[in-house]
Structures are given as C-alpha cells and as structure tokens.
Amino acid sequence: MSLCTLEINLSAIKNNYRLLQDICKTALVGAVVKANGYGLGAMQIAKALIKENCQYFFVATSEEGINLRKVLNNDITILVLNGVFTHDALELIQYNLTPVLNNLSQIEIWQKFSNLKGKILPCYLHFNTGLNRFGLNSDEIEQLINDRDLLKGLDLQYIISHLAASEETGNPYNLIQLNRFKVYLEYFPNVKASFANSGGIFLGQDYHFDLARPGAALYGLNSLIEVSSNLSYTEEFESNTAALTTTACINKCPDVSVRLTPKLPLKGSYTVRLQNPVTLKAPIIDLQNLTLDSHIGYNMTFTTKRDSVIATLPLGYADGFSRNFSSQGEVFINSCSVPIVGRVSMDLINIDVTDLPPSEVFLGQEAEIIGNYCTPDKIASIIGTIGYEVLTSLGSRYKRKYIS
C-alpha cells in the first residue's frame, strides 16, 4: 500500500448535498457516483448520502451499478447512464438496476427482455437536446410519439437530457436546450423529468424539473458559484409553436429563433461556496543536499541555481499525478508553498524545500498535494485540464481514509 493518504471528508460531501437540496426547493436531488464516485469511493459516498435522504444514484455502467447494489437496499434507485446492452440486460434485472435508454436499439433490447421475463421493466429515456453525445435524436423521439407501442412493457419513469455548457451561466445554448426539452416533454405529460446536472442547478428553478443530478458539485468542484433565482437571459421568441404536430414541432424546436442577451451578474443571483472534501498527503521519504548546478530527475530537465535541499515524495504518474507537473506546480508543507522540480516519474516526485526552516524538513514530514491550499480545480488549471479529471485519476494505491 502507498505511503500516501487520500482523505475523503464525507461530512463535506453531505454538506454540499444539503446546500444543493436547499437550492432545488421544488425538485428531488440525486447523486452521480459514476467512476467510483469520481475516484473518491462510490459505496462510501452513497451510504453517507442515504442518511441525507438521497434516493437516486447514477452510475455509468452495469458493473458499477452491481457493485453499488451490493451495499444499497432495493428501495434505493440506481440508474445506469450508459443504458442496456444484450450482454448485461439480465444482470440489470437481477440487481434491480434501471437503465437510461439512449436510442431505439436499447429500447428494443429492454422491451425484448420485458417480454422474456413477462414483467414490466422500469426505464428512463434520454433525449438529446444538443450535447450530441448520446440520447434519442429528434427522429427517434418522433417515432416514440407516433407509436407508443415502442414502449409497451416498459415503465417509463423519467425523461432526462444533459446540458452542454451549464457551467457557463451566460451561454445562450443553455436556454436553447431548455426550450427543446420543454417541447419534447409536451408529448409525455405524465412523465417526470430530469435536466439539471451540477451546473444546471445553479442556472435557476426553470432547469430543475423533478430531479436534479449533481456530480461535480457534490465533490466541491467549481466551488465558488453564482446561483440564479431566475433565468440568466432576457428573452425574445419568434416561434410558431401553435401547430404542435410532431415533425413540425420537433424539427423547428432547435431553431426557435431565440434571441438571447446574457445578463451578468445574474438577476436575483447570490453566491454559494461548496466545500472541498479531498485531501491528499505524502510523506518525505528522502532528502538530498545538492550543490549549485546539480541535475534533478530524468533527462536532467531541472538544474539547481544554488545549493539546495531536495525532498522526494512517494507518488507519480502511476498514481494519477500528471507528468505535466514536471518542474511546475506546488505542494504545501505547514501552509508554505514548495515547488515541484524535475520530471514527475512513475512513483516519485521531487520538491525543493531549501527555503523551509530546517525544523520543518525531515523524513516523514507530510506534504499536502491536494487540499484547501491546492484544490482539484486549482491543480487542473495548472496542467490545462478540469477538476473532474484530477479526481477520477486519483490512483488506487493511495490509502483511503474516510472522515465522517
């Protein structure tokens, strides 16, 4: 096991969940725990959030759902976002997992197994409103509207869609997607809806519908957020929506001639701060006293400009610590910034502790890699990625410690 410790503060995650519940006054709030809870532990997070009355958990694959079901009672809903495939349909039924059906092929598969088992099977439908990554397209939705037998044997519980730019509060595409979604829902008046991811929650109540699906916000990503109590745009519509024939409505909906003027700061907005639940610490395992012009690490990419004290920490790119941190980035020792020097190798990194008091530099001294001084979002900005990737890349070798 690694000498590094990854601390996950479940209380912080629960606090973030409660904050999201407060914002979503008229909607339920689920939790996205795919990719092992963004690398932090899906089972532990789910068990903690159940205590906050969370009843809906979203995973990506059937395997993730099965692992989660082993620790959650059958009355808790587990949604599989990637849907159903022939090879795993029976497992979804066995473990009481609900697929999010993303195309007509998946609907046909789920209906086939409904007939095979002689029972009505639950499902969600995913409508593509503009992310264009997954989900039923307008032609497929039209087929469902015109032939309801395509859903025979299925218990359609929710219709969902996914925002493409929800973290950009002034992006007019959010409202374009919202209006597409609303038009589609007109044809399914008795079905509940889910639209808001983390960013969508902060766009305002119009985006909340019946169930919100936060992931990143639970884990403290994009932590300082402006929340709108209403839409973040002035709107002018020129749309002939009186004729709600399926083809006309669906085909025109994406281009309803919406003219949007972003309003920033948001009208009726307020600011909230999410808590970072993640701390990664690594001990100093070696110290080198080097003279001027000494080379450090592979390919001698860093050369000391003075007599230096260089410490070694036991983590590297095999643990998800990107090589892009080579000779850039920082760690913290007793709240003091310490630069990373030389190449990040598979299992080790070097830091320059020359400027620290000698009393703070010793074998076993802990350096904070991720924490309140250097959050996942800050780390991401240094290496040109996003906080999601930082968290989901956290290696399996870290000793995980859960704080309740």
Swiss-Prot record:
Transmembrane segments: none annotated. InterPro entries: Ala_racemase, Ala_racemase/Decarboxylase_C, Ala_racemase_C, Ala_racemase_N, Ala_racemase_pyridoxalP-BS, PLP-binding_barrel, RPE1. GO terms for molecular function: alanine racemase activity; pyridoxal phosphate binding. Residues 226-273 form the RPE1 insert domain. It comes from the Bacteria. The active site is at K34, Y298. Its EC number is 5.1.1.1. This is Alanine racemase. It comes from Rickettsia prowazekii (strain Madrid E). The lineage of its organism: Bacteria, Pseudomonadati, Pseudomonadota, Alphaproteobacteria, Rickettsiales. The gene is alr.
